[in-house]
Structure formats: structure tokens, C-alpha cells
Amino acid sequence: MFELSTIYAAFERYFGKPPTRIARAPGRVNLIGEHTDYNDGFVFPMALDRATYVAARPRDDRIVRVFSVKFRDEDQFDLDHIVRDTQRQWVNYIRGVAKGLLARDLPLRGADLLIDSDVPSGSGLSSSAALEVAVGYTFQLLNQINLLGEELALLAQGAEHSFVGVKCGIMDQLIAALGEAGHALLIDCRDLSYRPIPIPTGVRVVVCDSGVRHRLAGSEYNQRRAGCEEAVRILRPALGKIQALRDVRSTDLAEYGHLLPPELLPLVRHVVSENERTLAAADALAAGDVVKMGQLMVESHQSLRDDYCVSIAELDTLVDLALAAPGCYGSRMTGGGFGGSTVSLVEAEKVDEFVAAMIAGYAIRTGRTLQPLVCTAGAGVSCVYASEEE
């Protein structure tokens, strides 16, 4: 459990004065619906009870000073001259959010920020979006700005596009802003509408970090997004006014898939089938059919492995181990891929046996130490401390 007193004291030690606000934004795990968000599709994430925290105090000038506890590093920039840092990626998330707020002609003053987090970095649990949303919300608190959750999510996404260089979809930022405790959200990434669906009390969501770190800013992620966009251009003359792969159905692909070059067909097949699986999974979980939900998770992993080619050996091993472990309904890789984590749906009464089996099995198969996280669906971004001092 993250202690607010720890970040409060750290801020006071570092900056010499106490913070006036502390905000938090959660990491997330996506139950199903992978690489669909930037195709205007459907996703089914839940916010975690692990989060990024920002302690803050306003300044009387235009300078923003930042200290990251996790990176043991600091940054300073002027709100009137915000540029990308070519050496340190973590600072660009913060600079990009500030730049985005200013681009909307919103009033900002300088601030001292101290950041800490218990969301593992690089594990596919969206630590980056948690940072962006937490920082954006902190600037709102300090400057009396009122943005809707959807607006905050779009602002954070824009920061990642322009300042970090990852053309991510909207899912990670949206669930960080709008998550509901005890629920997963079925999100339509085209119009940003969503439907909360309760997590059944008899199951647990378990995340297993492969220990392999990924770099989404690398070429693989952006190449796949570009491939999906190219496929839309190729299919549009045959299918009419389609805007994204979200508008393509399995029947369309069966009829017109021959128009696609061999390297694009598997990408499209994954996105189209994953959208259909995600809608079916949300209905299954809403009905309490965890067996069906688990089957769809397994199919999702197979598609990500074989068609989208974003899984790796360690993720495949974790899924294989999970499906053989006690109480597991289904398992899949989660996040962008090339490393990161798996997510498993597990019978609550057998979760301890499941965790023990995963730890032992992964050590035997890979020599790595596994630390499974039994997760609770948490709430979205919020202010967790406010002093009377302004």
C-alpha cells in the first residue's frame, strides 16, 4: 500500500516546503481488446489499485521543477519555452502535458512537482499514461482548471504523440481518467463512450510481469499502426466510406481480404477479430460467464501471437503456465507486447495455488523470479490530499 505520508515527507525534504496538493492516477490492465484502440475499436480495461502520485506546490513564476523518486532524477523547464529533452524520455511526458495545456490557452503558473509510483515501468500496465494523467490533473488543481475526464485523456494522449513519439491509442489515458472501482470499462475508442461492467466477486485478476522490458517508441509499434492505416486505404474503395479497421467485419474480410498484401492481412485479421472478441467478452462478464470470458482471452492471445506478432517467448510461457495452473479461466498477454505482462482470470478460492504454481513454473522454465500481482479494480484520477494553503 502506497503511503501518502511518504511522498509528503519526500516533497518537503526536497523542496523545503510542504505540498499543497497530492494527486494520483492509476495504472491499468487490459482484460481484452489489444491494438484495437488506435483503430477506433473497442477495449475492455480496468484501472488498478496501483498508481502514480504527484505531490505539488504552486510557484509565483513560470518555472516548473520536477523530481522523480523512481528515477532519482530531476528536471526544470520554463513554461514559456518548452522543448523536448533528447536524452531523458521520462521528462517529456511532463513537458508534453504542460505544452498541451498551454496550447489550449489555459492559464498555468510554475510549480514544484515530486513524482512517485508503485506502477511497474515497462510491464504493460501503462505507467506512462498514469504519469501523464496525474500530471495533467495536478496542473488542473493548481490552476483552477476544469477539464472533463475525456478532455484530460485526450490531452495526455496528445502529449505522448507529440513529445514522446508514440502514436498510442486513447485507452490507457481514458481508463486512468475515468476508471471505476470494482469495474472494468468497455470503451468505444471512436466516440469515447463507455460502459462499466462489475468484476464478479468470485474471480481475481492476476498480472504476471515477464521481466522483459519493451520500448514502444521503437519502430515495431508504429509500423503496425501504419500498416493498419494502409489497410484501410486499400479496402476503402471496396467497402465504401470506412474510417478505420473498426468498420471492417469478418464477413468483409472474407470477401475482400485478397486485396490486401500478405504482410497486412494478418494485422487486419487480428484487429477485426479482436473487436468482435472484446464485445463478446464484455457481454460474457456482464452475465457472469467467466468460462466464456476466459476462452475469449485465450483466443486473443493466440491472435496477438500468430497474426499481430507482438508476443515473445516469455509471454507465451506465462500463458501456457497459467492455463495449466489451478483455477485459471483464461490468460493472455496484455499491453503493447514485445515484453511486459500477462493477465489471467482466476477463481478466487484458488488464487493462492495459482500464484504459487506460476512462481515455481516460471523459475523452472526461464530462471526468472516472478512476482504475480493479484489486482483490484481501482478508481480513476483523483486528488488525495489538499491543504488549506493556496
Curated annotation (Swiss-Prot):
Sequence positions that bind Mg(2+): 128, 160
GO molecular function: ATP binding; galactokinase activity; magnesium ion binding
One of the GO biological process terms: galactose metabolic process
Family matches, as SUPFAM superfamilies: GHMP Kinase, C-terminal domain (SSF55060), Ribosomal protein S5 domain 2-like (SSF54211)
Location within or outside the cell: Cytoplasm
Active-site residues from the entry: 172 (proton acceptor)
GO cellular component: cytosol
Binding-site residues, substrate: 34-37, 221
Cited Gene3D superfamilies: 3.30.230.10, GHMP kinase, C-terminal domain
Family: Belongs to the GHMP kinase family. GalK subfamily.
Protein name listed in UniProt: Galactokinase
Native species: Chloroflexus aggregans (strain MD-66 / DSM 9485)
